[in-house]
Amino acid sequence: MTQLYSIELIEEHEAVNFYSLHLDEKELSELERFFEKFPEGCYFDEDVDTIIAWLDRIGELGALERYFRYEGRYGDGVSAIPIETSNLRLYCIRLSDKILVFGNGGVKDCARWQESETCLVLKNLD
């Protein structure tokens, strides 16, 4: 089944622009849906704070390759934040130092993103 989606601008920074996938049948973008799953005060607060700190750093310095954990096949650009050990992963596609497209993410529930239920939106893109 093909899902219809758009890519919307989330934030503009001098060094990088953040975009997010937005499935047509959903009210929120995938990035917004990620943060909705982990409200302030939840069990994963520390992990969310780590991801936010990385987003701030990337916003300031750009989407440099060294800031990402590569999760996909060679050359597909699928990456995750944070690069360090964490219970959560926020998945994205790094197109360049200046363009970052976020998908969704969640609790690290398997060894490979292709096996994760939370990453189906990335796997099913046409």
Model-derived segments and their meaning:
Residues 89-91:
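Short, surface-exposed charged micro-motifs
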Residues 1-87, 109-126:
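Basic, Lys/Arg-enriched alpha-helical interface segments
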Residues 93-102:
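Active-site beta-strand-loop-beta-strand hairpin of nuclease catalytic cores
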